[in-house]
Protein backbone atom coordinates (compact mmCIF):
# COMPACT_ATOMS: atom_id res chain seq x y z
CA UNK A 1 0.00 0.00 0.00
CA UNK A 2 2.90 2.35 0.64
CA UNK A 3 3.65 2.33 -3.08
CA UNK A 4 0.52 4.44 -3.66
CA UNK A 5 2.04 7.18 -1.52
CA UNK A 6 5.33 7.15 -3.42
CA UNK A 7 3.80 7.56 -6.89
CA UNK A 8 4.76 10.88 -8.52
CA UNK A 9 2.35 13.77 -8.81
CA UNK A 10 0.76 13.86 -12.30
CA UNK A 11 1.74 16.86 -14.40
CA UNK A 12 -1.93 17.83 -14.68
CA UNK A 13 -2.10 18.22 -10.91
CA UNK A 14 1.03 20.42 -10.84
CA UNK A 15 0.09 22.71 -13.70
CA UNK A 16 -3.71 22.87 -13.53
CA UNK A 17 -5.58 21.21 -10.65
CA UNK A 18 -3.60 22.46 -7.64
CA UNK A 19 -3.10 26.05 -8.95
CA UNK A 20 -6.82 26.24 -9.75
CA UNK A 21 -7.84 25.09 -6.25
CA UNK A 22 -5.23 27.21 -4.47
CA UNK A 23 -5.68 30.46 -6.42
CA UNK A 24 -9.45 30.44 -5.87
CA UNK A 25 -9.10 29.49 -2.18
CA UNK A 26 -11.22 26.38 -2.75
CA UNK A 27 -8.62 24.46 -0.74
CA UNK A 28 -6.36 26.50 1.53
CA UNK A 29 -4.58 23.69 3.36
CA UNK A 30 -1.09 23.03 2.03
CA UNK A 31 -1.23 19.52 3.49
CA UNK A 32 -4.35 18.66 1.48
CA UNK A 33 -3.01 20.21 -1.73
CA UNK A 34 0.35 18.42 -1.47
CA UNK A 35 -1.35 15.05 -0.89
CA UNK A 36 -4.20 15.46 -3.36
CA UNK A 37 -2.57 13.19 -5.93
CA UNK A 38 -2.14 10.43 -3.31
CA UNK A 39 -5.84 10.69 -2.42
CA UNK A 40 -6.59 10.32 -6.14
CA UNK A 41 -4.37 7.22 -6.40
CA UNK A 42 -6.06 5.63 -3.37
CA UNK A 43 -9.51 6.21 -4.89
CA UNK A 44 -8.35 4.69 -8.20
CA UNK A 45 -6.83 1.74 -6.32
CA UNK A 46 -10.18 0.94 -4.70
CA UNK A 47 -12.02 1.33 -7.99
CA UNK A 48 -9.68 -1.11 -9.73
CA UNK A 49 -10.50 -3.68 -7.05
CA UNK A 50 -14.20 -2.89 -7.47
CA UNK A 51 -13.94 -3.58 -11.22
CA UNK A 52 -12.02 -6.78 -10.47
CA UNK A 53 -14.89 -7.93 -8.28
CA UNK A 54 -17.54 -6.83 -10.76
CA UNK A 55 -16.06 -8.36 -13.90
CA UNK A 56 -13.88 -11.25 -12.69
CA UNK A 57 -14.46 -12.41 -9.11
CA UNK A 58 -18.22 -12.36 -8.60
CA UNK A 59 -20.01 -13.12 -11.93
CA UNK A 60 -19.46 -16.89 -11.76
CA UNK A 61 -20.03 -17.00 -7.99
CA UNK A 62 -23.31 -15.08 -8.25
CA UNK A 63 -24.50 -17.24 -11.16
CA UNK A 64 -23.75 -20.38 -9.15
CA UNK A 65 -25.62 -19.00 -6.12
CA UNK A 66 -28.72 -17.95 -8.06
CA UNK A 67 -28.84 -21.27 -9.91
CA UNK A 68 -28.43 -23.09 -6.58
CA UNK A 69 -31.32 -21.11 -5.07
CA UNK A 70 -33.56 -21.81 -8.04
CA UNK A 71 -32.83 -25.50 -7.81
CA UNK A 72 -33.10 -25.97 -4.04
CA UNK A 73 -35.09 -23.14 -2.50
CA UNK A 74 -37.30 -21.26 -4.89
CA UNK A 75 -40.70 -22.59 -5.93
CA UNK A 76 -41.48 -21.60 -9.46
CA UNK A 77 -44.63 -19.57 -9.99
CA UNK A 78 -46.46 -21.13 -12.91
CA UNK A 79 -48.32 -17.85 -13.55
CA UNK A 80 -45.06 -15.99 -14.14
CA UNK A 81 -43.90 -16.07 -17.74
CA UNK A 82 -40.44 -17.25 -18.63
CA UNK A 83 -39.68 -13.77 -19.94
CA UNK A 84 -40.56 -12.18 -16.58
CA UNK A 85 -38.49 -14.81 -14.78
CA UNK A 86 -35.52 -14.06 -17.03
CA UNK A 87 -35.85 -10.31 -16.38
CA UNK A 88 -36.03 -10.90 -12.62
CA UNK A 89 -33.00 -13.20 -12.76
CA UNK A 90 -30.96 -10.66 -14.74
CA UNK A 91 -31.89 -7.82 -12.37
CA UNK A 92 -31.01 -9.88 -9.30
CA UNK A 93 -27.79 -11.09 -10.94
CA UNK A 94 -26.59 -7.56 -11.75
CA UNK A 95 -27.57 -6.16 -8.35
CA UNK A 96 -25.85 -8.94 -6.40
CA UNK A 97 -22.63 -8.56 -8.41
CA UNK A 98 -22.54 -4.80 -7.80
CA UNK A 99 -23.36 -5.06 -4.09
CA UNK A 100 -20.83 -7.87 -3.62
CA UNK A 101 -18.13 -5.74 -5.22
CA UNK A 102 -19.01 -2.81 -2.95
CA UNK A 103 -18.80 -5.02 0.14
CA UNK A 104 -15.45 -6.37 -1.07
CA UNK A 105 -14.05 -2.83 -1.12
CA UNK A 106 -15.62 -2.08 2.26
CA UNK A 107 -13.81 -5.11 3.68
CA UNK A 108 -10.55 -4.21 1.93
CA UNK A 109 -10.53 -0.61 3.13
CA UNK A 110 -11.25 -1.64 6.71
CA UNK A 111 -8.20 -3.91 6.61
CA UNK A 112 -6.05 -1.11 5.16
CA UNK A 113 -7.05 1.63 7.63
CA UNK A 114 -6.97 -0.76 10.58
CA UNK A 115 -3.44 -1.81 9.65
CA UNK A 116 -2.17 1.77 9.60
CA UNK A 117 -4.25 2.86 12.61
CA UNK A 118 -3.27 -0.07 14.84
CA UNK A 119 0.36 0.25 13.77
CA UNK A 120 0.25 3.84 15.03
CA UNK A 121 -1.83 3.33 18.19
CA UNK A 122 0.10 0.27 19.41
CA UNK A 123 3.43 2.09 19.21
CA UNK A 124 3.78 4.18 22.42
CA UNK A 125 6.59 6.25 20.91
CA UNK A 126 4.31 7.26 18.05
CA UNK A 127 0.88 7.56 19.69
CA UNK A 128 1.47 8.25 23.39
CA UNK A 129 4.69 10.14 24.08
CA UNK A 130 4.12 12.99 21.57
CA UNK A 131 0.47 13.44 22.61
CA UNK A 132 0.51 14.11 26.35
CA UNK A 133 -1.46 17.36 26.18
CA UNK A 134 -4.73 18.58 24.67
CA UNK A 135 -2.75 21.02 22.52
CA UNK A 136 -0.71 18.22 20.94
CA UNK A 137 -3.76 16.05 20.30
CA UNK A 138 -5.62 18.89 18.58
CA UNK A 139 -2.86 20.66 16.64
CA UNK A 140 0.04 18.22 16.10
CA UNK A 141 0.55 16.43 12.78
CA UNK A 142 2.97 13.77 11.60
CA UNK A 143 3.35 11.59 8.55
CA UNK A 144 1.78 8.50 10.18
CA UNK A 145 -1.54 10.19 10.97
CA UNK A 146 -1.38 12.06 7.67
CA UNK A 147 -1.19 8.76 5.78
CA UNK A 148 -4.20 7.44 7.70
CA UNK A 149 -6.22 10.51 6.68
CA UNK A 150 -5.12 10.10 3.04
CA UNK A 151 -6.35 6.50 2.86
CA UNK A 152 -9.61 7.40 4.61
CA UNK A 153 -10.31 10.35 2.29
CA UNK A 154 -9.39 8.32 -0.81
CA UNK A 155 -11.88 5.63 0.17
CA UNK A 156 -14.70 8.05 0.98
CA UNK A 157 -14.19 9.97 -2.27
CA UNK A 158 -14.60 6.66 -4.07
CA UNK A 159 -17.57 5.86 -1.81
CA UNK A 160 -19.36 9.08 -2.86
CA UNK A 161 -19.05 8.09 -6.52
CA UNK A 162 -20.04 4.45 -6.03
CA UNK A 163 -22.98 5.34 -3.75
CA UNK A 164 -24.24 7.77 -6.39
CA UNK A 165 -24.12 4.98 -8.98
CA UNK A 166 -25.37 1.98 -7.00
CA UNK A 167 -26.84 3.06 -3.66
CA UNK A 168 -29.19 5.57 -2.05
CA UNK A 169 -28.94 9.24 -1.10
CA UNK A 170 -28.20 8.68 2.63
CA UNK A 171 -25.06 6.72 1.69
CA UNK A 172 -23.95 9.58 -0.57
CA UNK A 173 -24.43 12.00 2.34
CA UNK A 174 -22.47 9.66 4.63
CA UNK A 175 -19.59 9.63 2.14
CA UNK A 176 -19.60 13.43 1.84
CA UNK A 177 -19.65 13.99 5.62
CA UNK A 178 -16.87 11.44 6.18
CA UNK A 179 -14.74 13.06 3.46
CA UNK A 180 -15.19 16.49 5.05
CA UNK A 181 -14.31 15.21 8.54
CA UNK A 182 -11.08 13.52 7.43
CA UNK A 183 -10.15 16.53 5.27
CA UNK A 184 -10.40 18.60 8.45
CA UNK A 185 -8.05 16.08 10.04
CA UNK A 186 -5.56 16.39 7.18
CA UNK A 187 -5.55 20.22 7.41
CA UNK A 188 -4.23 19.42 10.12
CA UNK A 189 -6.77 19.60 12.96
CA UNK A 190 -7.25 16.80 15.53
CA UNK A 191 -5.19 14.58 13.22
CA UNK A 192 -4.34 12.41 16.23
CA UNK A 193 -7.99 11.33 16.44
CA UNK A 194 -8.10 9.95 12.87
CA UNK A 195 -6.73 6.49 13.86
CA UNK A 196 -8.60 6.71 17.17
CA UNK A 197 -12.04 6.96 15.58
CA UNK A 198 -11.13 4.56 12.77
CA UNK A 199 -11.17 1.86 15.45
CA UNK A 200 -14.89 1.81 14.64
CA UNK A 201 -13.78 -0.22 11.60
CA UNK A 202 -12.95 -3.18 13.85
CA UNK A 203 -16.57 -4.26 13.48
CA UNK A 204 -16.49 -3.91 9.69
CA UNK A 205 -14.97 -7.33 8.80
CA UNK A 206 -17.62 -9.21 10.81
CA UNK A 207 -20.32 -7.00 9.30
CA UNK A 208 -19.16 -7.80 5.77
CA UNK A 209 -18.66 -11.51 6.52
CA UNK A 210 -22.25 -11.51 7.79
CA UNK A 211 -23.48 -9.96 4.53
CA UNK A 212 -21.53 -12.41 2.37
CA UNK A 213 -22.72 -15.29 4.57
CA UNK A 214 -26.38 -14.34 4.18
CA UNK A 215 -26.05 -13.85 0.42
CA UNK A 216 -23.86 -16.81 -0.53
CA UNK A 217 -23.87 -19.55 2.12
CA UNK A 218 -26.52 -22.31 1.91
CA UNK A 219 -29.03 -21.19 4.56
CA UNK A 220 -30.31 -24.72 5.25
CA UNK A 221 -26.86 -25.97 6.21
CA UNK A 222 -26.48 -26.35 9.99
CA UNK A 223 -22.74 -25.79 9.71
CA UNK A 224 -23.22 -22.54 7.77
CA UNK A 225 -25.89 -21.41 10.23
CA UNK A 226 -23.44 -22.05 13.06
CA UNK A 227 -20.76 -20.01 11.28
CA UNK A 228 -23.23 -17.15 10.87
CA UNK A 229 -24.22 -17.37 14.52
CA UNK A 230 -20.59 -17.26 15.71
CA UNK A 231 -19.86 -14.36 13.37
CA UNK A 232 -22.95 -12.50 14.63
CA UNK A 233 -21.85 -12.96 18.24
CA UNK A 234 -18.37 -11.70 17.34
CA UNK A 235 -19.94 -8.74 15.56
CA UNK A 236 -22.00 -7.80 18.62
CA UNK A 237 -19.05 -7.99 21.02
CA UNK A 238 -16.67 -6.06 18.75
CA UNK A 239 -19.36 -3.55 17.78
CA UNK A 240 -20.08 -2.75 21.43
CA UNK A 241 -16.40 -2.55 22.38
CA UNK A 242 -15.26 -0.47 19.39
CA UNK A 243 -18.25 1.71 18.58
CA UNK A 244 -20.07 2.10 21.90
CA UNK A 245 -17.53 1.83 24.74
CA UNK A 246 -14.50 3.15 22.84
CA UNK A 247 -16.52 5.62 20.77
CA UNK A 248 -18.27 7.37 23.67
CA UNK A 249 -15.08 7.46 25.74
CA UNK A 250 -13.12 9.07 22.91
CA UNK A 251 -15.79 11.66 22.08
CA UNK A 252 -15.72 12.66 25.74
CA UNK A 253 -11.94 12.96 25.58
CA UNK A 254 -12.19 14.99 22.38
CA UNK A 255 -14.69 17.40 23.99
CA UNK A 256 -12.28 17.85 26.89
CA UNK A 257 -9.39 18.57 24.51
CA UNK A 258 -11.44 21.12 22.57
CA UNK A 259 -12.44 22.83 25.82
CA UNK A 260 -8.81 23.02 26.92
CA UNK A 261 -7.65 24.73 23.71
CA UNK A 262 -10.75 26.86 23.06
CA UNK A 263 -8.85 30.12 23.60
CA UNK A 264 -5.78 29.25 21.53
CA UNK A 265 -5.22 31.00 18.17
CA UNK A 266 -5.45 27.80 16.11
CA UNK A 267 -8.85 26.79 17.51
CA UNK A 268 -11.35 26.44 14.64
CA UNK A 269 -14.93 26.99 15.80
CA UNK A 270 -16.73 25.85 12.64
CA UNK A 271 -14.55 22.76 12.16
CA UNK A 272 -15.01 21.87 15.83
CA UNK A 273 -18.81 22.06 15.51
CA UNK A 274 -18.77 19.90 12.36
CA UNK A 275 -16.57 17.25 13.98
CA UNK A 276 -18.49 17.10 17.26
CA UNK A 277 -21.90 17.10 15.56
CA UNK A 278 -20.86 14.36 13.14
CA UNK A 279 -19.37 12.19 15.87
CA UNK A 280 -22.32 12.61 18.22
CA UNK A 281 -24.77 11.66 15.46
CA UNK A 282 -22.67 8.61 14.57
CA UNK A 283 -22.38 7.56 18.23
CA UNK A 284 -26.15 7.82 18.67
CA UNK A 285 -26.70 5.80 15.49
CA UNK A 286 -24.28 3.18 16.81
CA UNK A 287 -26.40 2.83 19.96
CA UNK A 288 -29.55 2.44 17.84
CA UNK A 289 -27.89 -0.15 15.59
CA UNK A 290 -26.55 -2.07 18.58
CA UNK A 291 -29.98 -2.12 20.22
CA UNK A 292 -31.35 -3.58 16.98
CA UNK A 293 -28.70 -6.33 17.10
CA UNK A 294 -29.64 -7.12 20.70
CA UNK A 295 -33.36 -7.32 19.84
CA UNK A 296 -32.63 -9.70 16.95
CA UNK A 297 -30.46 -11.86 19.22
CA UNK A 298 -33.20 -11.91 21.85
CA UNK A 299 -35.70 -12.97 19.19
CA UNK A 300 -33.48 -15.90 18.24
CA UNK A 301 -33.09 -17.02 21.86
CA UNK A 302 -36.70 -16.52 23.01
CA UNK A 303 -38.60 -17.76 19.97
CA UNK A 304 -36.04 -20.32 18.86
CA UNK A 305 -35.95 -18.96 15.33
CA UNK A 306 -32.94 -19.86 13.24
CA UNK A 307 -30.35 -17.22 12.45
CA UNK A 308 -30.99 -17.44 8.72
CA UNK A 309 -34.75 -16.92 9.20
CA UNK A 310 -34.23 -13.86 11.35
CA UNK A 311 -31.68 -12.36 9.00
CA UNK A 312 -34.02 -12.96 6.07
CA UNK A 313 -36.71 -11.02 7.87
CA UNK A 314 -34.27 -8.12 8.33
CA UNK A 315 -33.64 -7.71 4.62
Swiss-Prot record:
Keywords: Endoplasmic reticulum, Membrane, Transmembrane, Transmembrane helix. The chain crosses the membrane at residues 39-59, 102-122, 145-165, 171-190, 226-246, 265-285. Residues 1-38, 123-144, 191-225, 286-315 are cytoplasmic. Residues 95-302 form the TLC domain. GO terms for cellular component: endoplasmic reticulum; endoplasmic reticulum membrane. It holds the Pfam family TRAM_LAG1_CLN8. It is found in: Endoplasmic reticulum membrane. It is a multi-pass membrane protein. Its main location: endoplasmic reticulum. Residues 60-101, 166-170, 247-264 are lumenal. GO terms for biological process: lipid homeostasis. PANTHER family: AAR085WP, CT120 PROTEIN. Present with 1920 molecules/cell in log phase SD medium. This is Uncharacterized TLC domain-containing protein YPR114W. The lineage of its organism: Eukaryota, Fungi, Dikarya, Ascomycota, Saccharomycotina.
